[in-house]
């Protein structure tokens, strides 16, 4: 997998990839990553890349030429060009999976200022949002995409870790505990200390469903439940009065 991140603030990206799982993926040559400074593609004095908007209004707008030139400098026939934008599709685990399996080169353009010149969208394949809130720029969304896609790629983390993570089956993760067994009277569930693997797995399956039902019920309909979870879901709905 190759990533090209187009940004006005390359040091933000460099700082993140010097740590964490991305650093390991780079060292193991599981991914390639290039950081493109959009300012390198302006022909204006003082590396200017933004201008006031036509028609008046607050905020500066990124101009077409530096952004489009930066895209064209790295784009190939097999690339997908992503713009981080509050107007885009909301990023989730299913999108991360599809990007990880369907594309070999992902170009991420980080948004900034009041926005982009609308004509830039002609050079964009998909707009992605990470939520309905305002950020200073697109660097954080780009890193979220980078991290969530990369950890899915073969050889980056082990298969068991994937299977146990939240959202892998559209369910939240089960509770986890470590030492001490008793912390201020709050004890670890005895089943986890029993050594009985079947009972432990049953408990974890149940807890996944209970957690999702209570915290993110919107995920339930998209999940693949086993027989125990289906029965438990029926009981949970009955106790809540759902039909």
UniProtKB/Swiss-Prot annotation:
Q: Write down the NCBIfam families for this protein, in alphabetical order.
A: PRK00026.1, trmD
Q: Provide the reaction this enzyme catalyses.
A: guanosine(37) in tRNA + S-adenosyl-L-methionine = N(1)-methylguanosine(37) in tRNA + S-adenosyl-L-homocysteine + H(+)
Q: Does the keyword RNA-binding apply?
A: no
**What's the chief localization of this chain?**
cytoplasm
Provide the alphabetized UniProt keywords: Cytoplasm, Methyltransferase, S-adenosyl-L-methionine, Transferase, tRNA processing
Task: State the GO CC annotations.
Answer: cytosol
What Enzyme Commission number does this protein have? 2.1.1.228
Pfam families, alphabetically? tRNA_m1G_MT
According to its UniProt record, which protein family does this protein belong to?
Belongs to the RNA methyltransferase TrmD family.
The identity of this protein, by name, is tRNA (guanine-N(1)-)-methyltransferase
Quaternary structure note:
Homodimer.
What Gene Ontology biological process does one annotation of this record name? tRNA N1-guanine methylation
Task: Supply the InterPro entries for this chain.
Answer: Alpha/beta_knot_MTases, tRNA_m1G_MeTrfase_C_sf, tRNA_m1G_MeTrfase_TrmD, tRNA_m1G_MTases_N, tRNA_MeTrfase_TRMD/TRM10
Job of this protein: Specifically methylates guanosine-37 in various tRNAs.
Compartments where found = Cytoplasm
Binding of S-adenosyl-L-methionine occurs at 111, 130-135
Annotated Gene Ontology MF terms? tRNA (guanine(37)-N1)-methyltransferase activity
């Amino acid at each position: 997998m190759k990533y090209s991140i187009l940004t006005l603030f390359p040091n933000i990206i460099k700082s993140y990839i010097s740590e964490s799982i991305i650093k390991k993926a780079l060292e193991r040559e599981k991914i390639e990553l290039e950081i493109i400074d959009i300012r390198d593609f302006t022909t204006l004095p003082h590396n200017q890349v933004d201008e006031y908007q036509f028609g008046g209004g607050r905020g500066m707008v990124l101009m077409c030429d530096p952004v489009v030139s930066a895209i064209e400098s790295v784009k190939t026939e097999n690339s997908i060009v992503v713009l981080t934008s509050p107007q885009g599709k909301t990023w989730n685990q299913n999108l991360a999976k599809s990007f990880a399996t369907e594309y070999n080169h992902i170009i991420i353009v980080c948004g900034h200022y009041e926005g982009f010149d609308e004509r830039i969208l002609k050079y964009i394949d998909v707009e992605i949002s990470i939520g309905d809130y305002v950020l200073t720029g697109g660097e954080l969304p780009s890193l979220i995409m980078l991290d969530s896609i990369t950890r899915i790629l073969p050889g980056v983390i082990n298969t068991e870790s994937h299977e146990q993570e939240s959202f892998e089956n559209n369910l939240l993760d089960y509770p986890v505990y470590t030492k001490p067994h008793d912390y201020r009277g709050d004890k670890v569930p005895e089943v986890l200390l029993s050594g009985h693997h079947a009972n432990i797995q049953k408990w974890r399956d149940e807890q996944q469903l209970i957690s999702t039902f209570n915290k993110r019920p919107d995920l339930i309909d998209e999940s693949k439940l086993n027989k125990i979870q289906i029965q438990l879901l029926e009981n949970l709905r009955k106790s809540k009065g759902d039909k």
